[in-house]
A protein has these predicted regions:
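Short, structured coil segments at secondary-structure junctions
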Residues: 31, 86-87, 197, 225
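Extended substrate/RNA-proximal surfaces in nucleic-acid metabolism proteins
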Residues: 47-172, 227
Length: 240
């Protein structure tokens, strides 16, 4: 349970050896909330074809959870038919897999190093804009997340103009913005600006263990900004 006066959903939960589907369902019940389960598409996850996607959805449909997908690369939707993708409750995507010099820069790794912050920020913004402009997604996860070597420059990097660009694109396409518990982004200022612009929000822990649904930062930001149930994403399908 939370102290908020609206129902809470953790839309960013992964199953793992530490959190199977039965454990996730029981945990959500104990916390008095609902979970959305996401999986990455790709060979490593046996999720490459329409048949794989239908099988994944059908399995999770037997449980009281929302069924999501978390692609990591631009153009992911070309690998699945529109009918198969329509079986999902939602698609969540972040900008953490950044195309870089013919490879990918993985923002979450702790040993990353890029010498020129300005070059990074320019490419990162271009990547975010591409996702919000082109990708068929419902939730933009971890907005304004920064790699560890630039995180101390958060306020310098996330100028009002850059935050406004992200917010406006999300609002224009009806993409919800995640408040990410585990990395404590975006900032209160960003959320306040987004609320004033008419954005919708989700909470996410990126949990792969019993910490899923354990919200502190999300609740604090929601309370400070004055988020209500009307500000939160609500999916058409009911679990109850």
């Amino acid at each position: 349970m939370t102290d908020l006066n609206f129902p809470v959903v953790d839309y960013h939960v992964h199953l793992s050896k530490d959190l199977g589907i039965e454990e996730a369902v029981a945990l959500a019940d104990r916390r008095g909330m609902e979970f959305g389960i996401v999986q990455h598409p790709g060979a490593a996850y046996d999720l490459e074809t329409d048949a794989d996607l239908r099988r994944y959805v059908a399995h999770l449909r037997t449980y009281p959870v929302y069924v999501g997908l978390q692609p990591t690369h631009l153009g992911w939707a070309a690998h699945f038919g529109e009918e198969a993708r329509a079986q999902l409750d939602y698609v969540l995507m972040d900008a953490d897999t950044l195309p870089w010099e013919g490879d990918y820069f993985l923002l979450w790794l702790h040993d990353n190093f890029i010498e020129d912050m300005d070059v990074f920020v320019e490419r990162y913004m271009d990547h975010i804009v591409a996702i919000l402009s082109e990708e068929p997604i419902d939730i933009f996860a971890r907005p304004t997340f920064l790699p560890i070597n630039f995180a101390r420059h958060y306020e310098e990097i996330w100028t009002e103009a850059r935050m406004r660009r992200i917010i406006d694109l999300a609002v224009e396409r009806g993409i919800a913005l995640e408040i990410a518990e585990n990395v404590r982004v975006p900032s209160v200022e960003f959320v306040r600006m987004a609320k004033e612009a008419g954005a919708t929000f989700t909470f996410g822990t990126n949990g792969r263990n019993p910490n899923a649904g354990n919200f502190h930062y999300c609740c604090a930001v929601a309370a400070e900004v004055g988020l209500t149930g009307e500000d939160m994403l609500r999916l058409p399908r009911s679990l109850g």
